[in-house]
């Protein structure tokens, strides 16, 4: 049974340390700070993002039914840990794409949990079969993390990014997720946020 976007957003997963919630307009300043950070945002964009641009993006996002945009938030402190989205949803093909991932430097230890929450939402709640993630080949930490989680390389598009970098499309299937989650479940520790 398919639910509307509004219904799906009422039933978001929680982990040991984090929960997902839909992004809100008031998150715009934090998202801009992350995106405009020279280290965090270096693989995202070539221009600085303005508050007006982010707010406009948020308004357009709200109208889309093929896009779920989240803030992963710490359960105890309610501090934002990351932004992450499940975008370009194709319900006929039962596929979605990881997008807009930015992890706060203080939350890097929780990256596996952030992905686990997104996978739970994608596979268990939306019933998707496949989640893909596009990563620049020069982004070694992201590339290595996707491999470590068990994503498979689906394809490599040469010179496909705005900076001329190759883009690797990684793939995680609904069938592989439970087995892989068991393999990396040690990364889902019950840490105490600082």
Regions found by a protein language model. Name each.
Residues 59-73:
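A short helix-loop-beta-strand connector motif used in the catalytic cores of GNAT acetyltransferases and
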Residues 30, 53-57, 117:
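Alpha-helical elements of Rossmann-like donor-binding domains used by nucleotide-donor carbohydrate transfer enzymes
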Residues 1-28, 34, 76-194:
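Acyl-donor (CoA/ACP) binding surface of acyl/acetyltransferases
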Residues 39-59:
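Conserved GNAT-fold acetyl-CoA-binding loop/helix
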Residues 42-44, 70, 180:
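Short, hydrophobic secondary-structure boundary micro-motifs
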């Amino acid at each position: 049974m398919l639910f509307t976007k509004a219904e799906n957003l009422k039933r978001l997963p929680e982990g040991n340390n984090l929960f997902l919630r839909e992004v809100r307009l008031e998150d715009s300043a934090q998202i801009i700070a992350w995106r405009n950070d020279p280290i965090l945002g270096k693989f995202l964009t070539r221009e600085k993002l303005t508050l007006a641009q982010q707010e406009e993006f948020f308004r357009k996002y709200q109208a889309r039914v093929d896009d779920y945009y989240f803030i992963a938030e710490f359960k105890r402190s309610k501090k934002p840990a990351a932004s992450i989205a499940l975008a370009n949803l194709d319900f006929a093909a039962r596929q979605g794409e990881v997008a807009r991932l930015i992890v706060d430097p203080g939350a890097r230890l929780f990256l596996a949990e952030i992905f686990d929450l997104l996978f739970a939402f994608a596979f268990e709640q939306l019933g998707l079969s496949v989640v893909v993630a596009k990563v620049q080949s020069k982004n070694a930490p992201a590339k290595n993390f996707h491999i470590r989680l068990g994503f498979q390389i689906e394809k490599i598009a040469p010179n496909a990014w705005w900076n001329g970098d190759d883009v690797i499309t990684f793939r995680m299937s609904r069938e592989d997720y439970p087995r892989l989650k068991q393999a990396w479940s040690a990364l889902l520790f019950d840490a105490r946020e600082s």
